[in-house]
C-alpha cells in the first residue's frame, strides 16, 4: 500500500533545497528534527502554499494555483485546485486536521502524513482501512508559533520514529501558506462530511477534484479562520467520481453534501463561530462542506449536482470593497 509519508518526503526535501526561493526558513532543532517555517517569521509564497497543501494530502494529489476559473467577473480571487486519484487516503488519511498537538504551552492543529503513523484519530483509519508504516514522520501544523524539541520528541514518540526523521511544517492561519492550504481542503470537506455526518463509505470515492478561492490576508488568525473557511463553504466547487452499490442513494447524498444543507447556511463562518461561543463542537457538522457538489456515479453513469456559490456572503466575510 502507498505510504503517505514516503510519498511526501521528496516534496519536503525540495522545499528545504529551495527555501530562499519559496520565502520559507529551515530550522534544525537540537534533537535532529527539522522545522520548516512557512509563515510564522517569514512571508511564505504561493508556491510554498501549493507544496504545503500537497504534503498535507500525503503527496497523493496534484495541486495548482490559478487566477482563472474563479467566481465571476465581479469578484476575482486566486484559486487553489486539487485533483486526486486516492481521495479517501489523501484527504482523510492525511489532510484531515485530526491531531490536536498539545505539548506544554504549545498547541497546534496537526494534519498531514504523520497522522497515519500515530493513528490520529484511530477510528478514521479503521473506517478507511489504512495505516502507514514509514520510518519518517511529516506533520503539518496550523499555528502562530514554531514548535520546539519537546514537540518534535512528542511527535516522534507517537509516530514510532527516530526524532531525526521528524519534519514539522508550520503555517499560521493569517499567512499566504495558511490561506492556500485551508482552501486546499475543498475536496476533504466533502469526504469528511460523507464519512462523519452522512456515514457514507468514502472508499467508494475513486477520484475527486475541487477548486476554491484563496482568502486574502485580512487580519489576525481569528479573522482569517472565518475568511478561510468561507472560501470553501461559499466558494468551493467539487467533483466526485463514486462507484456506488445498488443500495446507495447518490442523489440523496449529493443533495445532503453541500454547505447549503446546514441550518447555519447564509452567515459568514466567524458569525456562526461567535454564536457557538467559539466552540467548534457546537457548530452544525453539515456546515463544513463545499458550496457545490457534483457526483458522477460510475456504476450507473448518472451525473448529479447540487449547491451554489454565494458571492454575497464571501464579500461580506472579506469586507470586499469596490472603488
UniProtKB/Swiss-Prot annotation:
Q: What is its EC number?
A: 3.5.4.27
Give its localization.
Cytoplasm
Pfam family name, one: MCH
InterPro entries linked to this entry: METHMP_CycHdrlase
Keyword terms of this UniProt record: Cytoplasm, Hydrolase, Methanogenesis, One-carbon metabolism
**Its principal location?**
cytoplasm
Q: Which residues form the signal peptide?
A: none
| Example of a GO cellular component annotation carried by this entry | cytoplasm
Q: In which pathway does it act?
A: One-carbon metabolism; methanogenesis from CO(2); 5,10-methenyl-5,6,7,8-tetrahydromethanopterin from CO(2): step 3/3
What is one Gene Ontology biological process annotated in the Swiss-Prot or TrEMBL record? Answer: methanogenesis, from carbon dioxide
Catalytic activities: 5,10-methenyl-5,6,7,8-tetrahydromethanopterin + H2O = N(5)-formyl-5,6,7,8-tetrahydromethanopterin + H(+)
In the record, the note on similarity to other proteins reads:
Belongs to the MCH family.
Question: Which purpose does this protein serve, as stated in its record?
Answer: Catalyzes the reversible interconversion of 5-formyl-H(4)MPT to methenyl-H(4)MPT(+).
Q: Which HAMAP family match?
A: McH
Please give the name of this protein. Answer: Methenyltetrahydromethanopterin cyclohydrolase
